[in-house]
């Protein structure tokens, strides 16, 4: 399978064993730095993908204490089995937590949540690192689609929908990619079932490279699906991070015993092709 490589390199000073005092000071500094919660992994400002350089255009590392509303708006619809609430989107401990609860709101027995980017994007590389909720009944998605400001999905406002990951939480060892055409008559172009590690036990990285003629899907940096999309209509796309209670995937009911639960995102990033 195809792999992508990060073009960032790291260089720095290394301490020799013959300089124990310097090594001790360096080790003590690192210990204090990490203990104080000041350590963070640098975000790659550029990536080398298929022989081309892509530059960071948008990112959220979720290192604050609340959702950054300069970047995001909230999903607030009632759909399938849940109502989506802004308060269920919590930023804490370096993660976006979309909290999932058993509570009745607007005649729905459960509440979910989601974020929708304020900006619209186009061709480039989209990536997130995420972990799905425990317990059956939840439809988690990392996807791209236009947005009309209504608080929910509106296919009439977009030409295409790109589903980078769709998972129904009763399934822990796989997910689906998908592509929909919404302009004119709806067409489900289809996708692939991707076998994975346990999605609710550890974080997994999922991504797609969106080009004018092709769409590449990646799981943990490995190519898992490809679509030829030269004839597919195009439109501006918002980034969606969402989780709703749903019957999708043949789900019969929500596993109440494992609630509350949460869909977790470590980060989301978008890179665009660097211009010569």
Regions found by a protein language model. Give the residues of each.
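GH16 jelly-roll
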Residues: 45-276
């Amino acid at each position: 399978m195809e792999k992508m490589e990060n073009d960032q390199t790291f260089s720095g000073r290394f301490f020799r064993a013959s300089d124990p005092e310097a090594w001790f000071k360096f080790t003590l500094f690192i210990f204090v730095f990490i203990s104080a919660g000041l350590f963070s992994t640098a975000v790659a400002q550029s990536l080398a993908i298929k022989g081309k350089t892509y530059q960071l255009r948008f990112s959220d590392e979720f290192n604050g204490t609340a959702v950054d509303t300069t970047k995001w708006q909230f999903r607030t619809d009632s759909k399938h089995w849940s109502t989506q609430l802004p308060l269920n989107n919590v930023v804490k401990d370096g993660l976006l937590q979309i909290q999932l609860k058993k509570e009745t709101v607007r005649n729905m027995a459960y509440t979910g949540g989601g974020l929708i980017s304020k900006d619209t994007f186009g061709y480039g590389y989209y990536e997130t690192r995420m972990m799905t909720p425990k317990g059956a009944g939840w439809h988690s998605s990392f996807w791209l689609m236009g947005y009309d400001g209504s608080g929910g999905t509106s296919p009439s406002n977009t030409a295409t929908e790109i589903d980078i990951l769709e998972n129904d939480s009763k399934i822990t060892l796989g997910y689906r990619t998908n592509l929909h055409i919404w302009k004119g008559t709806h067409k489900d172009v289809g996708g692939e079932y991707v076998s994975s590690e346990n999605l609710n036990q550890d974080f997994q990285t999922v991504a797609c490279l969106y080009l004018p003629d092709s769409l590449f899907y990646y799981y943990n940096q490995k190519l898992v699906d490809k679509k030829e999309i030269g004839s597919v209509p195009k439109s501006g796309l918002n980034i969606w991070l969402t989780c709703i209670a749903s019957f999708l995937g043949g789900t019969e009911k929500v596993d109440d015993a494992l609630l509350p639960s949460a869909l977790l995102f470590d980060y989301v990033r978008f890179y665009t092709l660097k211009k010569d």
